[in-house]
């Protein structure tokens, strides 16, 4: 389920692109230093969003430097690291380890089994550091696995809720004033990721005869767009409650546009038109959530700002 919570690079400024890649490179270096070089293979942009979000909220001391690496041996690249990067590296390892286990259990993939074995010692260390978060991963993935093995129709919402609860715990590094809001952002974003993954895989799973939680609903992938927009709107409404300044436009880029890129690429004839439509749908859903008092965001004009930047 990696690859959904990413920035729409086409709509980012040069400064934002540099910041995004510096955070990504910092996460890569931290994975190698903290968890072992093989763990750098688990690197993904989804956790870069978590780094940017928590750094914007808590503003920890940050190290900024340049370095070469195996991927870029000839040119030095900027990177940034903080205690938030350490946390995101641990979460990355935990998710990657359990993804390998899941792939092995589902497909008997030899590569997944090798990956799980390679990450096992690092995961044991991470579990010692993050018992609450790793416990949530184990508990909620077990619940999802049970639902998927039962192949019961109508279980998509239950499974999405379970993944939402998983993500909710990962968004909270420590309990404080903002824990409930961060959990709410993670919960709605987790629901979105699970259902978006099911939508994008629906046709492929049907061809393979693989289980898909949406298979029994007899709906086209495009029929899920409204539901996905509502869920994304809920995540946005909670996100806008956070007192963020640093990287705010870049974070909004991810939530208003970036999370729709795979959907737009697969189901929209014109991806740019689709991205604008999706952002408008998310804005409407966030406004609706605020007006009903369910998710009263404090900055519901974020999508307008994002669209003005596009223009």
Task: Place the predicted regions along the sequence by residue.
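Ser/Thr/Pro-rich low-complexity tandem-repeat tracts
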Residues: 277, 281, 287, 291, ...
